[in-house]
Amino acid sequence: MEQGAKRVRFYIVAADGLSKRDLFRQPDPFAILTVDGEQTHTTKVIKKSVNPYWNEGFEVTVKPSSVISIRLFDQKKFKKKDQGFLGLVSFRMREVGSFRSNREVSLTRPLKKSSTTNLSVLGNLVLKVAPSKIRAPAGNHSSTTANRTTSTPTTTTARTTRTTPRPTATTNTSNQSTSNSTRNGTSAATSNGTGTGAGTGASHRSSPVTNRQTNNTSALSNSNAHIMSSFEDQYGRLPPGWERRADSLGRTYYVDHNTRTTTWTRPASSTNPVHNTSSDSQRLNHQNRHLPDDSNPSLMQSDSGNDLPFGWEMRYTDTGRPYFVDHNTRTTTWVDPRNPLVRPNGGSSTVGSLMQPQSLSHLGPLPSGWEMRLTNSARVYFVDHNTKTTTWDDPRLPSALDQDVPQYKCDFRRKLIYFRSQPGMRPLPGQCNVKVRRDHIFEDSYAEIMRYSAHDLKKRLMIRFDGEDGLDYGGLSREFFFLLSHKMFDPIYCLFEYSAVDNYTLQINPHSSINPEHLNYFRFIGRVIGLAIFHRRFLDAFFVVSLYKKLLRKKVSLADMESIDAEFYRSLKWVLENDITGILDLTFSVEEDHFGEVRTVELITNGENIEVTEENKKKYVDLVTEWRVSKRVEQQFNAFYSGFVELVSPDLVNVFDERELELLIGGISDVDVEDWKSHTEYRTYIATDPVIKWFWEIIAGWKNEDRSKLLQFATGTSRIPVNGFRDLQGSDGPRKFTIEKAGTPDQLPVAHTCFNRLDLPDYPSKDTLHEKLSLAVENTVGFGNE
């Protein structure tokens, strides 16, 4: 027998992967909810998105037999017959689990075709159904929620036993997710995170605000909450170091200031052995998962017998964390000045083997936004809060490079530190999500990048490849720029061309106007280059010198012609160096072949009738050079430049010269095996193990092209920073290339591109290693979950 009618609240949360029917335009989706063909509600319109997020709730009256229908439409085509339909979800209320219970139910349903139209339909719809008396959460919800797994361990409290969400530990120095993706040669997948085995689902880190589950501990009434302090609740006073707080939905959670973690579960008393074990385990996991804080008891000595240096004072924060005030320089630090500081780098340095606080004070305070910290082994590292990165190098030192490093690298590095420390080059809060298909990366990237404002593109860039669930902590974005640069600079698109038959440097194609949208594409490419510089990524491309000079607004010269057309350059140089009287019959005009049609272009007014003489030949050469390098591609370059300066201010980039700008955009393509080897770390392996020796022997015997492929396989990019492998970037700053013993000899090597790590099984012979490594590098494409 059917139950009577009841009120529920339907939430249309989000849709994921909707069909995109226009090449350069995304739909403006909205949803229409209908109950039994009578009750109708409509969501707002989300502009230009195939992954819309609404999270809108509607009160409806339903019965178990009620038919729920949600239809999605493109608002721009809604009034056009059979064109605006994006998908349909339909089901009966009895199909929704726990209809009779008073709890939330989440649904993810694939979108279906309509019986009245034959349009293709893609994607899923995410819904929530909640009793009307329960207020559904309105936290941040990603359009990919349906693919994530929320951890809901069973927790016993003083009064109730139920399944509750437990937020994972977080700190203010790390936002890394434990969701991992691996690049595995066997399954043709590549990793973007850490992990130990393939095939397990990616975990999703929850927090008190974003977790979607309700909690019994949030049942405190407002009348009781205001009469209790934050250090007690209805069960009594909390243990020392604990605090009770409420999120934006009124749900209670607990903060452990001892370990800087949060939990939905009320902490038990210290006499509870189960809680002690759990707390110890959480502390251990917290220490293993994050960089240690400088408040490590082993490093913070409060013994009054060990006096502070003159002018120093130790104080405490509200949470009891000690910090130190240097009244000499009017600065504060977490680092105890009584502890000797280990030098920042592991190699030789002019700083000395140990840096005492007195020697550091001579360098002056750290730049704005920088902080010095210590690892467990008391090794100093530096945090740049402006760019949210870490480094071993002291930013106050002129250079931490070795003494034999060329001067140009030292100069470039100083400029780079200055360039990246400027406010205009600091990432903005939030994320910029870009989802593309590998086989349509050019078209998808154009649509995604051009729909964002320059402000949004300066947020943290998160790349996602369609059908691959890897989280982007650096490896995916490096792979993205590598693949995209191969596509958008391909001469087949007529946007760029090679400068000469024997030279693979690129220049703007003067005949790009064959594509009526070419100026929009040049603005897009300018944005991509600016985006790569802003987010510290490399493009796998090199341009003619004149293009770098024009980006810096420098005047081009005859010497720049050599990289464009060496034969034409030699001809013009001969004209300047020799008497042309009676030898050459030239006028102030040039001929241009435009798809088989020869056109005459006058360099000056009536130039076709003005003869070039010994007196005016210098002017002729200058005009020809300017036309060949600049004038004939002026429109294209202006569009290209307009996109570039949206991300990178011309006043900032002018600190570099044209050669340094080339390194900033493309890095170094030649792979130095000795430099690679000297800046590699090993886990479980040691440098003298046979497999490691075979590995470097194989790499040394490869061509540079094959080495670049391996580098791209393991790190996501084939380019190297100008300072070599010592400056290789990971997910959170500089991270060395690492080889770890993992897997069995019948498996292929596995790459973790976010962490520059290669999992290498202990192969029995050099031939086996060579075969497996080559197979993995040549045939692995894509990402999967660990």
Curated annotation (Swiss-Prot):
Residues covered by region (Disordered): 134-225, 263-306
User: Per UniProt, which keywords does this protein have?
Assistant: Repeat, Transferase, Ubl conjugation pathway
Annotated WW domain ranges read 236-269, 306-339, 364-397
**GO MF, one example:** phospholipid binding
The record's section on Pfam families has: C2, HECT, WW
Question: Boundaries of each C2 domain copy?
Answer: 1-109
Q: What is any one of the record's Gene Ontology cellular component terms?
A: cytoplasm
Its UniProt pathway annotation is: Protein modification; protein ubiquitination
Q: PROSITE patterns attached here?
A: C2 (PS50004), HECT (PS50237), WW_DOMAIN_1 (PS01159), WW_DOMAIN_2 (PS50020)
- InterPro entries reported in the protein's UniProt record: C2_dom, C2_domain_sf, E3_ub_ligase_SMURF1, E3_ubiq-protein_ligase, HECT_dom, Hect_E3_ubiquitin_ligase, WW_dom, WW_dom_sf
**Active site positions:** 754
- Domain HECT, chain residue ranges per copy: 453-786
The UniProt record's further free-text remark is:
A cysteine residue is required for ubiquitin-thioester formation.
Which PANTHER family does this UniProt record tie to the protein?
E3 UBIQUITIN-PROTEIN LIGASE PUB3 (PTHR11254:SF436), HECT DOMAIN UBIQUITIN-PROTEIN LIGASE (PTHR11254)
Name of the protein in its database record: E3 ubiquitin-protein ligase pub3
Which organism is this protein's natural source? Answer: Schizosaccharomyces pombe (strain 972 / ATCC 24843) (Fission yeast)
